[in-house]
Amino acid sequence: MKSIPSLACYLAEAATRWPHAPALRTQEQQWTYREWLAKVATVADVIEPSLHPLIVSGSSLDLARYAFACSSRNRPFQPVDRNGLPIPASPLPPGVALVITTSGSEGEPRGVMLSDANLDAAAAASNRHLPLLPGDLWLDCLPLHHIGGLSILWRCTRAGAAVLLHEGFDAQALAVSLAQHRVTHLSLVPAMLAHLLDTGIRPPVSLRHVLVGGAALAPSLFDRAIDAGWPLNPSYGMSETAAQVATHTAADGPWHAGLVGRPLGANELTLAADGRIRIRGPQIMAGYVGGGGVAADGWLTTGDLGEIDAKGRLTVTGRADDMLISGGRNVHPLTVESCLAGCPGIRDVAVTGVPDPVWGDLVVALVVGNAPPASIDDWCRTRLPGAARPRRIVHLASLPRNATGKLEREALRRLAREAKP
């Protein structure tokens, strides 16, 4: 039986094939593949093989080192947020390479168990879909305790490309890196993209792909970015699928809100009877720490709603548990948010509901910006059905988001309840 390559296998092969090629760099340091292999070896020497995950917090560089080192010692790796709660280590089933803690934006965080096979399938599919070649450079400013940031290590090392690590997102620091280095790939969440556009940063000619995910991308933001020359690839994925499982490219035709294209690689997509997105394929996790997560037939039923057209293209329409019932009609916050994002004077927006004796769920828009309520209402009257129009507007200095840019829905509901009518 053919063995499944691990992150450590990628590194060993790359150090043999491209020993002097850049492997990883920060804003201050850089390592070739041969140098990075030696650096990882010094960390691996003090790691004992075990079925208990090695739980590590620290800088992005720390997490990158330990990801490779744990792989070389066949030890499950579990990166965690430096500001998060301590997580007890427990023995895992054989074959688990990585444990990623979900964001918890929709409930309690859970540990997602991923195998080398999951991670290899995800890296291979991504590298084919958004071609990643030896000598390319992927700028990674996402947190490495989340799958979106960490998976870039697998993709680049598998391809013989290099990773440019940033310690979090800073628009000016990112602008400097884009000017100084031949960056070909970049991963962002929509809030980061909006900040780049607001500061007037332009994309370099070397940039081929900007992977955008982690939260809904508003059409107005997409249009602004495309007009400014940013080569966007809206994507869909999660910890449970080892990152992106569908990503829009020009081959999928014109983009519209929520469109993420066809499934990558050998993954399959379908919809449950209630409209939830179901996924099956080699990227699907082994399960959650403590059990559960994947049906016996291999299908993962997500908490996301979607539509699949005749060409097999997926459009994500929102979270199933965010659905509001306003005036007897189903209203999804994402639909209203996409509309409001284009309203002049609104820089950021989220929509939720509060209980109401007349409407059932009263639609509440939480807005960052200077658009007055009357202007917002006028904007919505010609663009949204009556049941979906916000009946209450709450102005905020900022919206509650987690480290990956996802809206914290429970915090939004609390803010809406606490706001004065």
Ranges and model annotations:
Residues K2-A8, H20, I87-T101, E108, ...:
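Conserved pre-ATP/AMP-binding loop-to-beta segment of ANL
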Residues D120-L137, H145-H185, T199:
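Conserved AMP-binding/adenylation subdomain of ANL enzymes
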Residues K2-S3, L7, A12, H20-E48, ...:
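Conserved AMP-binding/adenylate-forming core of the ANL superfamily
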Residues H185-L188, L196-W255, E268:
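Gly/Ser/Thr-rich phosphate-binding loop
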Residues S3, Q29, A44-D81, C141, ...:
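Conserved AMP-binding/adenylate-forming
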Residues G281, L305-A388, S398, G405, ...:
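AMP-binding/adenylate-forming catalytic core of the ANL superfamily
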Residues L259-A266, A272-G298, R319, V331:
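Conserved ATP/PPi-binding loop(s) of AMP-dependent carboxylate-activating enzymes
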Residues T32-R34, A97-A124:
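Conserved AMP-binding A3 loop
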